[in-house]
A protein has these predicted regions:
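Flexible "cap/lid" subdomain of the alpha/beta-hydrolase fold that forms the substrate-access gate
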Residues: 1-157, 161
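Catalytic active-site module of serine/aspartate enzymes centered on a nucleophile-bearing elbow/loop
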Residues: 153-191
Length: 191
């Protein structure tokens, strides 16, 4: 990531900086979480599309902060209520953000300790993503195709790209995700 995003902002590189992301988020945890959830769902990505490159990825200077320039919607999305957000804020007020951010900080360790990660998955697999998930932008330069995903699985049973859905797939489209999961489980003989 460091070489690809040398000249522009990339959230995973920003999260590597100990204490910086924590400080930014914890200044106003409710607003920080609200912006994060609302900017990476389908509605937020669509609202930001005029400020984003064609591959759905925000273009900011490499020294920008995470929340800089984020769209601030006036209403909650259908999948998130004020009570949901209050609960999440309370949880992070108790635990802080270091743990979740350390997941990003430990990525390089994964490659050393888990060399098998470069091998295709052998088990039957199901891949569900939102067509507007920004993660697809840096992995595939847009919405992935089945062929791009199949390279990583020996038995990709189900591939589904959910239209108008962003990063929070199961929250944004719970009925569709549940239907697809049941279809996948049925196809592999689960009862």
């Amino acid at each position: 990531w460091r070489s690809v995003y040398r000249e522009q902002f990339f959230y995973q590189l920003y999260f590597l900086k100990q204490g910086i992301a924590e400080q930014e988020f914890e200044q106003n945890l409710q607003r920080s979480l609200y912006l994060t959830y609302c900017n990476f769902d389908g509605r937020g990505v669509a609202a930001n599309s005029s400020h984003r490159s064609l591959d759905l990825e925000p273009v900011k200077r490499s020294d920008a902060s995470f929340l800089a320039g984020m769209y601030e919607p006036k209403t909650y999305p259908d999948w998130l209520t004020p009570d949901d957000l209050a609960y999440l804020v309370g949880q992070f007020e108790n635990s802080g953000l270091r743990g979740p951010l350390n997941r990003y900080r430990a990525q390089n360790i994964d490659w050393y300790q888990l060399p098998q990660l470069s091998q295709p998955v052998e088990q039957p697999a199901c891949f569900i993503t939102g067509a507007l998930d920004p993660v697809n932008a840096f992995l595939f330069r847009g919405a992935p195709t089945r062929a791009q995903i199949e390279k990583h699985y020996h038995n990709l049973v189900l591939f589904e790209l959910l239209e108008d859905v962003g990063h929070w797939t199961q929250q944004e489209a719970p009925a569709a995700v549940n239907t697809l999961l049941l279809k996948f489980l049925e196809s592999v003989g689960a009862k």
